[in-house]
């Protein structure tokens, strides 16, 4: 825990004071309901500014996971995204999106480093338009003070994710992410980091706080 706090406190102050930086507050949950099945839950509150007072998007996502084995998971789910224009006086979302998604996650290890490959296909209804999109994310988890990520571990979370459309503009966006995380318990961890999102020729940085809570509802008390 001390190492986690030291890294966060000594992060470059200039990085967190950029006027154009956004802020994402995130919750992720994988709730195991049987040996092979679990429920995914997710909430992301995204802001145009670093202060959480100018909402950009509210994303709600859920899904059903089937665990093929400990390193392979398939998911089918639904997501809703409410999009708000920067500094808009309107309280309701200007653009509403409903999406269905199919996903496959495959994990492998090289030494102490975990590599997580996530493949996702999305069917999107953006207001009255229908779109398809493919996403691939490669994420690395690197424990710093222990051989593996367990209770009390400080770790790095690093990923790159590319988004591709099936029509119109082929390239949709790319996200590059780096964070420091702390594993509080088997089910709970926190990551604090920065994401750089590139859309066409425009790019923006986002300060991120991500809480993960994965209770096992099958565990005997």
Question: Model-flagged regions — what are they?
Answer:
Residues 31, 66, 78, 106-108, ...:
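Residue-level signature of outer-membrane beta-barrel architecture
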Residues 19, 33-36, 71, 109-114, ...:
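Short loop/turn motifs that connect adjacent beta-strands in outer-membrane beta-barrel proteins
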Residues 43-49, 78-84, 108-110, 121-125, ...:
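Transmembrane beta-strands of outer-membrane beta-barrel pores
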Residues 18-77, 84:
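Start-of-domain marker
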Residues 21-23, 56-58, 96-100, 130-136, ...:
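Residues that define the transmembrane beta-barrel architecture of outer-membrane proteins
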Residues 39-41, 74-76, 115-119, 136, ...:
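Transmembrane beta-strands of outer-membrane beta-barrel proteins
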Residues 1-23:
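Bacterial Sec-dependent N-terminal signal peptides
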Residues 101-104, 140, 205-221:
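Outer-membrane beta-barrel "beta-signal"
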